[in-house]
Amino acid sequence: MLNECLTRCFHIGADGRHVAWCITMTTVYDIPADIFNPALAIAMADQKAVSMPDWGQYVKTAVDRERPPTQENWWQLRTAAILRKVARNGPVGVTQLAQAFGGKKDNGVMPNTPGVASRHIIRTALQQLEDAGLVEQVYLKSVQLYEKDDYGDFVYVKDEYGNDQKVPMKDEKGNLMKQDLYSGRGITAAGQKLVDNVAHSVRGEAEDQYPGLGKY
């Protein structure tokens, strides 16, 4: 049992005679994506909330792709990759993930331009992960809502000093109406436990394919 938990050791002192053993758990930061994502997709197979929608077999994953994916489990792989991104870089939003999963759009004789990934796919995957309890919205702040006219412009009134002031929105009880803003999705405790357990389970495979990982 001890050998399974001892993953790193450090030599302390100039003579190297003192050795301190650090009992650590392999985390999502230690495993390459090409090994981690398929293993995480398999681990999430029992999550009923994570499943490919009916339209998933017809869509492209990004504007720079020419055809839909051919892998049968591409939705699970993409969802696993999104969960890994959230675990490593969260809180993140749909736009950041769309840029991360994008590529280069072929413009023919013109220079290539960045092509973002499908936001609809990413948004749906995040909603499924949220339903599964693996990610959550990270609260940022609340902002006051103000009245607008039929043209979408703010409604102003004069204060006692003659300055224009926006009219705050109120509910039926006269309470000020506010809207919560979120900085993106972050991983939950259950999601962190899942990704760390998957990372620990594939550490041996990762060290076999990438021998240099054993140094870290």
Language-model regions, residue ranges each:
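Positively charged, polyanion-binding regions of nucleic-acid-associated proteins
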Residues: 74-91
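Short, amphipathic alpha-helical interaction segments positioned at domain boundaries
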Residues: 147-216
